[in-house]
């Protein structure tokens, strides 16, 4: 906000970053949250604006903006399948990077689908990156199953048609998600 806007439009103090003392800068209140930078509790619900959780992800708006630099209106900033709060509080991953350990798998897929560690490229320390592993033995890597074919990396035959997902993709040319393709 420029000084004129602060004084004339919002009745805030140009030399004070957070006029109402709610933990959010005046500019963020106006441009991101559409809250009133002169009133601590814009909506009058008894929760000051900085403590609100606009996206209901478990992190306060002030925490998202001031600590993690994430958008308090977006529940999963990096679209990896984990909420920003899950990344920060549970898995200790980066809520702005979908693949924190850079192994070719989204953090959410590692934590919720494969049960691998989204902070370690090679969770079982066998020399193969988690994204290159093929735990179901179907001939497709975890990364291919999750990122390319949308098949189940824990199922040898995702559509239960008697052909492995890898055979359908690499040999037969059928759809590993459609039993009759």
Question: Where are the regions that the model predicts?
Answer:
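Extracellular calcium-associated, cysteine-rich motifs in secreted modular proteins
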Residues: 1-181
